[in-house]
Each structure stands twice: as C-alpha cells, then as structure tokens.
Amino acid sequence: MVRFQRRKLLASCLCVTATVFLMVTLQVVVELGKFERKKLKDSNVQDGHRDVEGEPKHLEPFPEKEALALAGRTKVDAGSYPIVLWWSPLTGETGRLGQCGADACFFTINRTFQHHPMTRAFLFYGTDFNIDSLPLPREAHHDWALFHEESPKNNYKLFHKPVITLFNHTATFSRHSHLPLTTQYLEGVDVLKSLRYLVPLQAKNNLRQKLAPLVYVQSDCDPPSDRDSYVRELMAYIEVDSYGECLQNRDLPQQLKNPASMDADAFYRVIAQYKFILAFENAVCDDYITEKFWRPLKLGVVPVYYGSPTIADWLPSNRSAILVSEFSHPRELASFIRRLDYDDGLYETYVEWKLKGKISNQRLLTALNEREWGVQDINQDNYIDSFECMVCRRVWANSRLQEQGLPPKQWKADVSHLHCPEPALFTFSSPASPALRGRSLRELWLPSFQQSKKEAQALRWLVDRNQNFSSEEFWALVFKD
C-alpha cells in the first residue's frame, strides 16, 4: 500500500513538473508571437523589405541561479532570451526554450522572427543552404552558423572561401571547425575494442574457399572520389565480392538488400567474414571520415581505405588499416593484399590492436573524450543540440562583454573549416572498361566543382551588398563573362 502511494505521489509530481514546463514554453511562444504581430502591424515596408531601424535590444544579464530555476517559473519574459532561428527547417521545432548550462535561448524555425530585436543568430544546414532565400539584410548583430556533416557533393559552393567565411560559427567534419564532427560515425572507444563480431582468422581462412579476400558494398555509384574506377581496375588483379549496386557481382540475402539494413546485425555478420573491406569515401576531403572506415574496424576486418588525406591522424593504431594512397597502382595494392592473405602472421599485425584492445592514437582518444556530444547515447546531447548550445552560449558571452563595456568577440570561419580539393580522376593504362571509367566524373563532378567557384563569388558579392536578390540576378552574375 505504501509503495502504491509513493508511486501515485511520484506520478503526480511528474505531471505537475511537465505542466509547468509546457506553460513556460507556451508563454514564451505567445509573448514572442504577440510582439511579432505588433511589429508587422507597425513597421514600414519599403521596396518589399522591412525597414528595421535602431539599435538591437540588449540582453539582460542572465545569472546562473535564474537559469537553473527556469523550469520552475510560471511566466517568462520573452525579452530576456535571445532568439536563435534555424533558417533551414532541420529540427522542425516551431518554438522551444532551450537550456544550455547557465544560459537559455529560444530556438525556432519560424521565419517571422527574422526581424525580431532579440534575434541573434541564424542557423543553416549545409545541404539545404541555397540562394533562393537568405535572411537579408543582415544586421550587425546577426550571426550566421553552419552545420554541415554530409558529403561535399551535396553543396560544393560551401567549400570555397567567399562562402565559408560568411559564417561566424561552424559544426563540420573538419577538426578545425568550431564544433568538430570528425568522429560523428563512431560511438566510442568500446565499439572499437569490442570482439562481438570478430571472426577468428582460422575461420576466415576456411571461408576463403567460397569468399574473396576483399568485399565492396556501395550503391552510390560514380561519386566525386571516382572510387568505382579504382575498384574496377583493382578487380583485374584480385578477387573482390561486390554486393552493392556498384560493380555488383554477388547478391546479399533478400532481407539485407534494403539500404536501411546496412546497420543490421545480420549484415554485420556477413561482412565480418571477410579479411578486408574496401572502405572508399564518396569524396576526398580532409577529415571527411564516414562509417565506411569505422565499420570494418568495429567488425574486426582490415579496412583498405581511400578518402580523407588526413586519415592517418585518426587510425586506432599505426597498423590498423591499409591506405590506398601509399600504392602507386591497384596492381601493387592487390599484390600486397595477397601477401597478407597468405601470411597469417603478417595479417595479424593489422588486427593485433583489436585483439589486445589497445588504441595507441592519443589524438583519437582525446577527440572522443573531449567531444561535447554523443552518438546514440541517451546520456549525452546529440551533435545538433550541442551546435545550438554552442551558438547560444556565444551569444550570451558577447552580451556579457557588452554589459561590461567591452567589444563583443568576433567569430569567423575560414577555409580550413571545410576543405576539399578539386575532384581528381583515376587514370590507368590497362583497359578495364575504358568506356565507363570516370564518365560521370568527367561529365558532372569536375564541371560542377568549377562552376561552384563562380557561384561562391556571385553569392558573396550579393550578400555583401546586403539586399535581397532574385535567382535570376544570381545566375546572371554566375554566367557573366
């Protein structure tokens, strides 16, 4: 009976807490909405754009005690919180008062808050960043922040100096970003050390009677890295089992053909049987490292890696992967892999770190230990929450500097925050499907990258002009002689 009463009391407390929190958030939304409607009614419109005059409203000091007691307040003064507006509707949140340590900000995708005097930052998702609609004119107190963890092929113009330097804050795959996402596909040290999927070497040797030494699983064919051209050439010198749509010569079980199954336990079991995995990225960029690299390491398979030129900085140990860049031709790579395939002692030097659970790379350990977000970890913020809070805390930090009569700190991205060279084409003397090799790269990726330079310059000029512009105006600049 006592236990039941305790549960009933606990449930009541939880309900009260939830109700109070909803009232707090609702009040913020209502207050902001009232202000915005009044602003729309009273403002003057000139040339189709709002005429915003006067100094932005200063943020009132937000002491830690008040921040920590936020959830217990029944009414929130909307004027006390900076607004952080997602210009890309990534989160889908129409309004949320988010707590970031001792600070709090109002996060929203509602573009009607663009000209609110408490709006301090605009957040952009790289893949969705386009010229069709930008928050212009840009006020002096408006920071721009970029979140881009995906492939550069999704939006090449971001990788050029005129565009990347438009942003004050960044969260990208580069270690030089303000919030590095380099290890975004790695849950932690434990999964690297885990032997859950490891197939003993003797069993792998027995499986070699029906399996190739190498496995390749890709369904995004002919990307900017031109990986399929390399693998096609490699196949002329060594057996490769290819399960994906690209260069396919072997079928996965029917239940594993859906791309969603790539993280399924059954798929891991199939791939873990191989000695080597061709881990080729779709683009060659510093620190752009995806699950293609981390997956074989988790499974106890040796990755044969092509992608980030800086990959050596992220290896668990010096001998944990075979780097394609160290071989002048696929023929040499094939010869080396065959040598490891026949020599158990030499092969085991590449999995020794896994068997002993010893990661010697301090850079990797430090990055995992110090990152402010987690991967599939309910006890940590995800990287989007961390990105939002980084911007929120910086907004408040500058507010406190201004309260002290000091100039605000100026943050600015540079080219190291997103660095990708021009796509390069593999050229081989042997005629391995010459009609197909590099076709899409020649016809699409190189011209796309080259045009993106012109797009970046045109966009920068228009943004610096600080007026809204049409797509016709933008493209006229891009193709101007």
UniProtKB/Swiss-Prot annotation:
Keywords: Disulfide bond, Endoplasmic reticulum, Glycoprotein, Glycosyltransferase, Membrane, Signal-anchor, Transferase, Transmembrane, Transmembrane helix. Gene3D superfamilies: Glycosyl transferase family 10, C-terminal domain. Disulfide bonds join C389-C392. Pathway: Protein modification; protein glycosylation. InterPro entries: Alpha-1_3-FUT_met, Glyco_tran_10_C, Glyco_tran_10_N, Glyco_trans_10, GT10-like_C_sf. Residues 1-8 are cytoplasmic. Its main location: endoplasmic reticulum. This is GDP-fucose protein O-fucosyltransferase 3. It comes from Mus musculus (Mouse).
